[in-house]
C-alpha cells in the first residue's frame, strides 16, 4: 500500500444487518408473547361457552371443573337455559389478564341471548351481559372472582 492509495474499506453493513435482524427478532418474540400469553385460558373459556351455545350444559359443567360446593343445580341456576346468565346464544372474549397478586387469570366475556352477537347499534345489545371468570392456569378450572 502506497501513501496515495486509500485505506481498504471495512464492511460494516453485515454488522448493521445482523443487529437489525436480531432487534426485529426480539420485537417479534415480545409481540407474540403478549398476543399468546393467555391463550390456554382463552381456549378453555371458548370451550366452555361453545358448549353452552350448543346447549350442552353437561359438557360445560365438566369444562368448568367445579368444586364440591358448586353443585350441578347451582351451575344450572347460573348458566342453564333459565339461569341468570342463560340462555347463552353468542359470546365474545373481550380480554384476559392476570390480576396483581393472583395466581389466576381473569377472562372477561360478553354474553348474549341472541345469535349472532349484537352490535352496539343493535337494540338487543342492551341485553348483553359482561361476566368475568377466573381461570386457574394449573388445572384450567373455572370460578367466579372473589
Show where each model-derived region lies.
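Generic structural signal for short, solvent-exposed loop/turn connectors between secondary structure elements
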Residues: 39-42, 66-70, 137-140, 145-146
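Short, intrinsically disordered/low-complexity patches at protein termini
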Residues: 7, 81-86, 93-97
Amino acid at each position: 500500500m502506497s501513501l496515495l492509495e486509500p485505506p481498504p474499506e471495512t464492511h460494516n453493513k453485515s454488522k448493521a444487518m445482523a443487529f437489525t435482524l436480531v432487534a426485529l427478532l426480539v420485537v417479534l418474540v415480545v409481540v407474540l408473547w403478549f398476543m399468546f400469553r393467555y391463550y390456554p385460558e382463552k381456549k378453555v373459556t371458548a370451550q366452555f361457552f361453545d358448549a353452552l351455545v350448543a346447549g350442552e350444559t353437561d359438557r360445560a359443567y365438566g369444562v368448568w371443573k367445579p368444586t364440591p360446593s358448586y353443585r350441578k343445580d347451582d351451575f344450572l341456576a347460573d348458566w342453564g337455559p333459565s339461569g341468570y346468565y342463560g340462555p347463552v346464544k353468542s359470546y365474545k372474549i373481550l380480554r384476559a389478564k392476570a390480576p396483581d397478586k393472583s395466581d389466576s387469570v381473569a377472562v372477561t366475556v360478553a354474553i348474549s341471548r341472541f345469535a349472532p352477537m349484537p352490535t352496539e347499534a343493535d337494540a338487543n345489545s342492551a341485553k348483553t351481559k359482561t361476566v368475568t371468570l377466573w381461570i386457574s392456569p394449573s388445572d384450567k378450572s373455572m370460578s367466579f372472582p372473589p
